[in-house]
């Protein structure tokens, strides 16, 4: 409701924090040998999350002027081997918040490349700092700009629950195979021995 999105329970996969959300989302939309792009500076554990899928993390150099996307570099690196783009806004460690203009341009470029390459390219949006913005700024909701978005969230920061390990993946209802991705993540969870988050903590957050 907050973001005017038509999510249903079929589009939400509860996880043990944002780390669990990223691990499941990446496994759901990548295959071994694929490339996953992210933008410098980035959270160093992305290396582990992507590496465990068998995919390759490729880092787009930072735009140090304002830490928005360097689109010239991004377009060069957005090759047919890319299956996902991992973004983090508000960003850890820079604190930068991607503007609506940046997200629109990012989405348009990725949509064009999907058509050119003939396959889906997903955005995996890492959003644990979504509520931590200052000076009257707002963090635009990434999934509003691009259909093939999986939003990964943690309540650790927004509710000060870092030790309780509670988060989720929200699959955009208009995403390709949206109704299949949550069941897929459920099977991934079983395969890697990843336990569901505590029902007690889920009730507390609710």
Listing of model-derived features with the role each one plays in the protein:
Residues 1-118, 130-145:
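Conserved core of the PLP fold type I
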Residues 148-206:
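Conserved core segment of the aminotransferase class I/II
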Residues 84, 122-123, 150:
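Hydrophobic "anchor" residues on beta-strands that sit immediately upstream
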Residues 39, 121, 194:
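Glycine- and other small-residue-rich loops at beta-strand/loop junctions that grip anionic moieties
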Residues 113-114, 121-122, 168, 188-189:
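Charged, low-complexity, helix-prone segments enriched in Lys/Glu/Asp/Gln
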Residues 127:
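Walker B catalytic acidic pair
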């Amino acid at each position: 409701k907050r973001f005017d999105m038509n999510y249903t329970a079929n589009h939400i996969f509860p996880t043990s924090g944002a780390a669990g959300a990223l691990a499941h989302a990446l496994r759901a939309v990548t295959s071994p040998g694929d490339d996953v792009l992210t933008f410098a500076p980035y959270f160093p554990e992305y290396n582990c999350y992507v590496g465990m899928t068998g995919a390759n993390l490729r880092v787009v150099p930072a735009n140090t002027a304002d830490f928005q996307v360097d689109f010239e570099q991004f377009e060069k690196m957005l090759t047919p081997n890319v299956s996902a783009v991992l973004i983090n806004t508000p960003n850890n460690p820079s604190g930068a918040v991607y503007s609506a203009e940046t997200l629109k341009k990012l989405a348009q470029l990725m949509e064009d490349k999907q058509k050119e390459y003939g396959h889906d390219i997903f955005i995996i949006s890492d959003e644990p700092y979504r509520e931590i913005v200052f000076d009257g700024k707002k963090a635009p909701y990434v999934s509003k700009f691009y259909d093939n978005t999986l939003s990964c969230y943690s309540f650790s920061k927004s509710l000060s629950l870092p030790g309780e390990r509670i988060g989720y993946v929200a699959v955009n209802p208009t995403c390709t195979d949206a109704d299949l991705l949550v069941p897929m993540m459920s099977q991934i969870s079983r395969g890697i021995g990843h336990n569901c988050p505590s029902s007690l903590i889920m009730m507390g957050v609710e």
